[in-house]
C-alpha cells in the first residue's frame, strides 16, 4: 500500500506539474484533498456493503456505486441511519464513479468543485476542524480554481479524477494507515530536492512517531477516555501514532 500511495502521489504531482502548480502550497492541498475524497468514497462503499439493510444488495451488485445510483432518496436516508457516526456520508451523485461518468459533460470542473463542497457540508458535523473561535472549517474546498486559466480547468479536473480512479483504499480499512504522513514526507522530499531548502526541518518522520508512541503508551492496556494533546502538532503524525497505539475506541 505504501508503494501504491507513492505512485498515486507522483501521478497527482504529474497533473499539478502539467498545469503549472508544481512545488506550490496549492499542490499539497490538491494532493491531500483528492486523497481524502478517494478515502471517503472507498470508506463509504466499504461500510455500505456491510449495512444490515442494504449491504447485500450493494455487495452482490457488479459495481456497488452503480447500484447505489438507483437508490431512492428514502433508501439513501435509511442507509445513512444505519451507518456508524464515524463513517462519511455520500449521496449517489457524490461517488467517484458517478463523477467519473460525468467527466464528458461540459463544465466538469464546476461539477467537481461543487461536489467536494457539498460533501464537506453534508459531513460538517463529524468531519470538520474547529478553530479557537469555535468556527468550523470544512475539509473540502474548490480545487480547480488554483488553475488560473479557466479554459484549462475542465481538463485539470478530468486528469485528477483519472489519477485517483485506479487506487483502492479498501485493503487498508482493517488496519491503521496514516496516508497524510506519506503524502507530506514524499512531497517534502521533492520540495527540498528541487529547491535545496530545508522545509519542515522539525517534522517528525512517521517511523520515529511510531516509536515515540510506543514509548509514551508503554505496556498499559487498561486506558480509558484518553485525550492526547500536542501543542506543536503540524501534520498530526504523532497524534495519529498515539491514537493507533492506544486504540481509537479508548
Where are these regions (language model features)?
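Conserved S-adenosyl-L-methionine
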Residues: 198-250
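Non-catalytic, mostly N-terminal accessory regions of nucleic-acid modification and defense proteins
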Residues: 1-220
Amino acid at each position: 500500500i505504501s508503494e501504491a500511495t507513492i505512485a498515486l502521489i507522483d501521478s497527482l504531482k504529474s497533473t499539478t506539474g502539467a498545469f503549472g502548480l508544481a512545488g506550490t502550497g496549492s499542490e499539497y492541498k490538491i494532493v491531500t484533498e483528492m486523497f481524502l475524497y478517494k478515502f471517503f468514497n472507498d470508506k463509504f462503499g466499504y461500510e455500505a456493503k456491510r449495512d444490515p439493510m442494504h449491504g447485500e444488495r450493494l455487495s452482490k451488485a457488479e459495481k456497488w456505486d452503480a447500484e447505489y445510483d438507483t437508490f431512492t432518496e428514502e433508501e439513501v436516508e435509511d442507509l445513512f441511519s444505519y451507518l456508524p457516526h464515524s463513517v462519511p456520508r455520500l449521496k449517489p451523485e457524490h461517488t467517484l464513479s458517478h463523477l467519473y461518468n460525468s467527466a464528458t459533460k461540459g463544465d466538469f470542473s464546476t461539477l467537481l468543485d461543487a461536489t467536494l463542497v457539498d460533501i464537506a457540508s453534508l459531513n460538517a458535523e463529524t468531519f470538520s476542524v474547529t478553530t479557537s473561535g469555535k468556527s468550523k472549517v470544512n475539509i473540502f474546498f474548490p480545487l480547480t480554481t488554483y488553475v488560473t486559466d479557466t479554459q484549462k480547468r475542465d481538463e485539470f479536473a478530468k486528469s485528477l479524477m483519472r489519477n485517483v480512479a485506479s487506487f483502492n483504499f479498501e485493503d487498508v480499512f482493517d488496519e491503521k494507515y496514516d496516508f497524510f504522513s506519506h503524502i507530506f514526507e514524499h512531497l517534502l522530499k521533492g520540495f527540498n530536492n528541487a529547491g535545496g531548502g530545508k522545509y519542515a526541518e522539525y517534522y517528525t518522520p512517521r517511523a520515529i512517531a511510531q516509536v515515540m508512541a510506543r514509548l509514551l503508551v508503554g505496556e498499559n492496556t487498561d486506558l480509558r477516555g484518553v485525550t492526547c494533546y500536542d501543542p506543536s502538532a503540524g501534520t498530526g503524525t504523532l497524534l495519529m501514532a498515539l491514537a493507533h497505539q492506544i486504540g481509537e475506541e479508548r
